[in-house]
Every structure is written in C-alpha cells, then in structure tokens.
C-alpha cells in the first residue's frame, strides 16, 4: 500500500478504484487490482 500526500491521481488509476474514509484516514481501495491501494494521512501524536 502506498502512502500519498494527495489521492487525486490515485483514485483515477483504475475504473474500480473507490475512495473510503476509515478511522480518520482516506483510503483508495481496488478489489480487482489490489496494487492500486493507497492511503492518505499519517500517525497522530497522542498527548
């Protein structure tokens, strides 16, 4: 899975790619071609 600062180009790589939000991060998932998976958003500091 790639960690990207912008998912603008990642969501247009394949026709089956969809953008979802989970636990404060934005993911691009592609079930037909899993190599296009990507995530935006890193770790948050606690405290």
Curated annotation (Swiss-Prot):
GO terms for biological process: translation. Transmembrane segments: none annotated. It holds the Pfam family Ribosomal_L36. One of its GO terms (molecular function) is structural constituent of ribosome. InterPro entries: Ribosomal_bL36 (IPR000473), Ribosomal_bL36_sp (IPR035977), Ribosomal_L36_bact (IPR047621). SUPFAM superfamilies: Ribosomal protein L36. It comes from the Bacteria. Belongs to the bacterial ribosomal protein bL36 family. This is Large ribosomal subunit protein bL36B. It comes from Pectobacterium atrosepticum (strain SCRI 1043 / ATCC BAA-672) (Erwinia carotovora subsp. atroseptica).
